């Protein structure tokens, strides 16, 4: 599942990909990942508002302060994309209702377990790269995140946003729905 997909990305983009943990993302020391093309997290749980703000900032930043332990910070170009995977469908990351920087997808399991699936994917990398180089794009740039917000507004994203509401708001919604169901109209 998640590991196979992320290992495929690593095989595809090689040294331009780094695996991070939630703690790596929260650390002030970022020299090992700030210069990468892709930052992947296998079991993401970044459900604090400050995590969300940092992700939002980084997803549109053109430059970023890189910092290594015991060294001065310095500014670098920042162009990384984040791939965050999780089995937690309700609350893997805090997402505000009008947010347009996340494209959340639910990926179904394969029909059967195939222990050589990663190797099969890796064997197809040359053909896959050829396809990417020679295909026509089907979308035009429509926003700062390229895609139209309506294209990336998925049911799974909506579910996460609903689960991100405060406990009081969720309880009030449930109470009002119960009242509406029991009242004769």
List PLM regions with ranges.
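Feature primarily recognizes SF3-like P-loop helicase cores of small DNA viruses
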Residues: 4-185
């Amino acid at each position: 599942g998640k590991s196979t997909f992320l290992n495929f990305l690593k095989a595809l983009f090689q040294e331009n990909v780094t695996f991070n943990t939630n703690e790596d993302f929260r650390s002030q020391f970022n020299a090992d990942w700030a210069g990468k093309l892709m930052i992947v997290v296998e079991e993401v749980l970044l459900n604090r508002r400050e995590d969300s703000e940092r992700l939002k900032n980084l997803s549109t930043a053109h430059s970023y302060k890189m910092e290594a332990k015991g060294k001065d910070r310095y500014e670098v170009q920042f162009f990384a994309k984040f791939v965050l995977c999780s089995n937690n469908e309700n609350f893997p990351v805090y997402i505000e209702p009008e947010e347009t920087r996340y494209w959340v997808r639910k990926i179904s399991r394969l029909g059967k377990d195939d222990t050589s699936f990663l190797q099969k994917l890796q064997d197809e990398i040359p053909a896959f790269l050829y396809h990417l180089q020679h295909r026509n794009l089907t979308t035009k740039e429509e926003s700062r995140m390229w895609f139209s917000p309506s294209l990336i507004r998925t049911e799974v994203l909506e579910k996460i946003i609903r689960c991100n509401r405060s406990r009081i708001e969720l309880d009030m919604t449930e109470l009002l729905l119960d009242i509406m169901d029991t009242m004769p109209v």
